[in-house]
């Protein structure tokens, strides 16, 4: 397998989709009963084992989540599905196989004979390039052309509860013998358009201004993120980012630098030193929730975007990954919740039929209001010091320029904190960045670990320069994943119906309705199997039961 293939299989797109329904119920302050007892995760009993599937030689059972862990109780991390081997009592009706007059690859894929010996990996395993006695006939001949990172990420899916899909259904390194070149005026390069991508357009632009918002409460930022990233699904404030079903053969290389190993519990986060570095969704949302218990804080929310290009996927005759087709074939024809949930967690609940690629740059500064008052610093001063009130200019090669006012920073006592540990204006900075290379992420991580709290517009410029090498989806039109099931596949109609049902059950299984309400106007959020209360600024505690 080539490095490009490994990249296509491993790429993960960090698309957080937080979904909000109606208002969260809460206790009246007069009904406050004190700190509630911990609630442990409670699951139903296992169902009976299913009949032995004659083709899969497996049988299945499932269970449901009745109550999620809350108030420091045990969270729900166990699978809802189970399987075991069995000896079938019925014969398996194998579908007719074969490619007729076409060439059958080692992967089982059928391709036209004209695609043999052309130096392209049309089979996915290079078996079409074996036994070539004549000179190869490359489609692009002597024309200079590069593989497009934008095209290779096109079509990648999302999970409506926010988890990153572990694989893509599309084989975007299949070209069907064509050499369709697309010119990128920014990198001055011709890129080859894959067969699955009907349209690929390079059009680089950046937001002229940063968007900045300030909030008095952390829940306001959480709601802002939800409103901007939610989809029109009735899923409530529920987020799930850890797969727990049977997907043992899939592994993910996270191109957006999500450090899964750094996930921490709320108690551990509270005990850690300031200025932590994280791209982990777990840490981001738990950190925002933890600040609801602290007084005299203000939150500056900074957002910037760079758009590199657009794509539209082909609507018919797409070339799907062999692993995706194998996964569909191994789905049982009877509805087994655990198996279908596992499929959704592997490939996503939806895929992108069209969209934009680039990067999103988002920072949340936690400011100390008392320190600002003592130094006579206003929010506008902070924005000017960091450079986030300036217009940006974009040049060829995705070069973004901008400057920050270092003289103003020094005058106001907001000097660079790597050399000025007394500058306690910035309590923390929480990064929420999508796109860009690992090299940039490492540099930013090292800067934050040295104690630098003033991540400024220069850091944005450095990040933007790396986007050509690692773009991500920044907007997309979504289509249910079951629409990709080939109509000629055995039991296609049954499995499509089962997947449609599974998406609805998936939302209901991981629903915030299985949480207990918070007290005193607190908002309950379901974070990866645990219900967490985000409190108004006047209250704190696991249930917002304590008045500050």
UniProtKB/Swiss-Prot annotation:
Topology of the protein relative to the lipid bilayer: Multi-pass membrane protein
GO-annotated cellular components: extracellular space; membrane attack complex; other organism cell membrane; plasma membrane
BP terms from Gene Ontology: cell killing; complement activation; complement activation, alternative pathway; complement activation, classical pathway; killing of cells of another organism; protein homooligomerization
Domain EGF-like: residue ranges: 515-545
Entry-linked PROSITE patterns: EGF_1 (PS00022), LDLRA_1 (PS01209), LDLRA_2 (PS50068), MACPF_1 (PS00279), MACPF_2 (PS51412), TSP1 (PS50092)
Disulfide bonds: 41-76, 52-86, 55-92, 99-110, 105-123, 117-132, 140-179, 385-409, 515-531, 518-533, 535-544
Glycosylation sites per record: 456
Residue ranges crossing the lipid bilayer per the database entry: 233-240, 270-277, 379-386, 387-395
N-terminal signal peptide: 1-21
Oligomeric form and interacting partners: Homooligomer; about 20 C9 chains oligomerize to give rise to a huge beta-barrel that forms a 100 Angstrom diameter pore in target membranes. Component of the membrane attack complex (MAC), composed of complement C5b, C6, C7, C8A, C8B, C8G and multiple copies of the pore-forming subunit C9.
Its job: Pore-forming component of the membrane attack complex (MAC), a multiprotein complex activated by the complement cascade, which inserts into a target cell membrane and forms a pore, leading to target cell membrane rupture and cell lysis. The MAC is initiated by proteolytic cleavage of C5 into complement C5b in response to the classical, alternative, lectin and GZMK complement pathways. The complement pathways consist in a cascade of proteins that leads to phagocytosis and breakdown of pathogens and signaling that strengthens the adaptive immune system.
Protein's recorded name: Complement component C9
Species name: Bos taurus (Bovine)
């Amino acid at each position: 397998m080539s490095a490009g293939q490994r990249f296509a299989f491993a790429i993960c797109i960090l698309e957080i989709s937080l979904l909000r329904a109606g208002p969260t119920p809460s206790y009246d302050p007069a009904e406050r009963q004190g700190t509630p007892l911990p609630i442990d995760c409670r699951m139903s009993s296992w169902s009976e084992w299913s009949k032995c599937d004659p083709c899969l030689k497996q049988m299945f059972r499932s269970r449901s989540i009745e109550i999620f862990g809350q108030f420091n109780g045990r969270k729900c991390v166990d699978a809802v599905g189970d399987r075991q081997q069995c000896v079938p009592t019925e014969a398996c009706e194998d579908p007719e196989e074969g490619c007729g007059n076409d060439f059958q690859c080692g992967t089982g894929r059928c391709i036209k004979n004209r695609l043999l010996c052309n130096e392209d990996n049309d089979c996915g395993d290079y078996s079409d390039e074996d036994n070539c006695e004549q000179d190869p006939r490359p489609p692009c001949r002597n024309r200079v052309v590069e593989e497009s990172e934008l095209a290779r990420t096109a079509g990648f899916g999302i999970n409506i509860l926010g988890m990153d899909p572990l694989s893509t259904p599309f084989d975007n390194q299949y070209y069907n013998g064509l050499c369709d070149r697309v010119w990128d005026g920014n990198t001055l390069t011709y890129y080859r358009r894959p067969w699955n991508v009907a349209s690929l357009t390079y059009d680089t632009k950046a937001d002229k201004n940063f968007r900045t918002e300030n909030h008095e409460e952390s829940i306001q930022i959480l709601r802002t993120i939800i409103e901007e990233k939610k989809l029109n699904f009735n899923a409530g404030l529920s987020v799930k980012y850890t797969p727990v079903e049977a997907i043992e053969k899939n592994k993910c290389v996270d191109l957006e630098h999500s450090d899964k190993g750094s996930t921490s519990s709320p108690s551990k986060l509270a005990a850690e030193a300031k200025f932590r570095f994280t791209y982990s969704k777990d840490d981001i949302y738990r950190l925002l929730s933890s600040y609801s218990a602290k007084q005299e804080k203000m939150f500056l929310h900074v957002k910037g975007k760079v758009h590199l290009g657009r794509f539209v996927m082909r609507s018919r005759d797409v070339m799907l990954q062999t692993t995706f087709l194998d996964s569909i074939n191994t789905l049982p024809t009877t509805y087994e919740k655990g198996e279908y949930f596992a499929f959704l967690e592997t490939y996503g609940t939806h895929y992108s039929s069209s969209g934009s690629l680039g990067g999103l740059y988002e920072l949340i500064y936690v400011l100390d209001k008392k320190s600002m008052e003592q130094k006579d610093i206003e929010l506008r001063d902070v924005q000017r010091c960091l450079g986030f009130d300036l217009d940006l200019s974009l040049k060829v090669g995705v070069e973004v320029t901008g400057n920050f006012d270092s003289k103003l920073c020094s005058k106001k006592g907001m000097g660079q904190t790597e050399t000025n540990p007394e500058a306690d204006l910035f309590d923390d900075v929480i990064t929420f960045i999508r796109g860009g290379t690992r090299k940039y992420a490492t540099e930013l991580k090292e800067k934050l670990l040295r104690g630098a709290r003033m991540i400024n517009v220069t850091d944005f410029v450095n990040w933007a320069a790396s986007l050509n090498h690692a773009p991500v989806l920044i907007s997309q039109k979504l289509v249910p994943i079951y629409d990709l099931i080939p109509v000629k596949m055995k039991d296609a109609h049954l499995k499509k119906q089962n997947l449609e049902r599974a998406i609805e059950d998936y939302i209901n299984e991981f629903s915030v309705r299985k949480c207990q309400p918070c007290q005193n106007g607190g908002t309950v959020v379901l974070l990866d199997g645990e219900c967490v209360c985000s409190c108004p600024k006047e209250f704190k505690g696991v249930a917002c039961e304590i008045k500050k």
